[in-house]
């Protein structure tokens, strides 16, 4: 039996070598997409609906291909960068307000993950009291329905009347580029179940939605685009919608528009005003298309502005 220790060592080493030669499986799924921050005693939860690759080289204008590539490279991104689709929940202690609803079924597997991530964050979609849409576009309003039924059955859906009048009227197809005309059918598909359920309640901005939450006009990207200003406990959070699509480009160069803008000149003017105010006031920003969680601040830079993301807090402060 004096050879037993040697034999055991050889067996163990052989097993170890076999284990090393077996390929390790990899997992593609990320952790549940939610992140919390505090606004006084109100809680803000950023919730991911997914990410989608956007061909900015075909969509941003005016900018040269060389300049676009250089701007994106400064952020270590390709010109067809994978872009976040972010939504946000405001918990006032009495109400749950969802700002934007993601893409629902309209972006395939790239979007539509909002309900599962809400549940992962401990938020039941049926407990949402109000859905505030920054505007009507697939990746913001598409998630209000699934299979012809409201995803948030107990919520009133609120959006500026000017977007309702525009996107639910096919006659306005002549007012947009051909590549945008699919938005009219998507808008009808998304909002019709909400309308039929008597849950759509439009407004005209500027207006107070409820104490502490105001809708501020931000037209240009769409006729009824708004920013939601949340003010509580001496702090302010601005929920931007589509003020920014490609922050490595549009922060240093706010004059760069995107082909999705219904009125590019107005969209640029809105962005310039919003960025200047955000940098001046130092308010918190919740951005739909800046890398998840899309929370941070805007600061002046040598050229235009720069994005400063929120510092990660395990306590959600």
Which residues make up each language-model segment?
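Cap/insert and terminal regions of metallo-dependent hydrolase folds
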Residues: 108, 227-229, 233-317
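Metallo-beta-lactamase
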Residues: 19-115, 119-123, 127-141, 234-241, ...
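Active-site metal-binding loops of divalent metal-dependent hydrolases
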Residues: 49-50, 101-104, 136, 162-163, ...
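Short, conserved loop/helix-junction motifs that constitute active-site signature segments
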Residues: 148-154
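Bacterial N-terminal signal peptides that target proteins for export
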Residues: 1-7
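N-terminal signal peptide c-region/cleavage motif recognized by signal peptidases
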Residues: 13-16
């Amino acid at each position: 039996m004096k050879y037993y220790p040697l034999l055991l060592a050889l067996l163990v080493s052989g097993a170890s070598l076999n284990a090393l030669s077996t390929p390790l499986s990899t997992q593609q799924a990320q952790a549940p997409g939610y992140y919390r921050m505090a606004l006084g005693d109100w809680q803000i939860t950023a919730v991911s609906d997914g990410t989608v690759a956007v061909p900015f080289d075909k969509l941003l204008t005016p900018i040269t291909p060389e300049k676009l590539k250089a701007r994106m490279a400064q952020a270590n991104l390709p010109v067809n960068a994978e872009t976040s689709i972010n939504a946000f929940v405001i918990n006032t202690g009495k109400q749950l307000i969802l700002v934007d609803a993601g893409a629902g079924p309209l972006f395939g597997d790239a979007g539509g993950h909002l309900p599962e991530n809400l549940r992962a964050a401990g938020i039941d979609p049926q407990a949402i009291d109000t859905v505030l849409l920054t505007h009507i576009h697939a990746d913001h309003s598409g998630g209000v329905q699934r299979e012809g039924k409201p995803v948030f059955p107990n919520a009133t859906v609120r959006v500026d009347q000017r977007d309702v009048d525009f996107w639910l009227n096919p006659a306005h197809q002549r007012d947009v580029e051909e590549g945008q005309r699919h938005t009219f059918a998507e808008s009808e598909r998304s909002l019709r179940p909400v309308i039929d359920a008597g849950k759509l309640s439009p407004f005209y901005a500027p207006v107070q939605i409820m104490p502490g939450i105001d809708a501020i006009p931000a037209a240009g990207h769409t006729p009824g685009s708004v920013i939601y200003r949340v003010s509580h406990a001496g702090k302010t959070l601005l929920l931007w919608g589509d003020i920014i699509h490609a922050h490595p480009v549009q922060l240093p160069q706010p004059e760069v528009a995107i082909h999705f803008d219904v009125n590019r000149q107005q969209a640029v003017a809105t962005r310039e005003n919003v960025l200047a105010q955000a940098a001046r006031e130092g308010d918190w920003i919740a951005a739909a298309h800046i890398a998840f969680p899309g929370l941070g601040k805007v600061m002046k830079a040598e050229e235009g502005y720069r994005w400063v993301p929120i510092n990660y807090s395990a306590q959600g402060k």
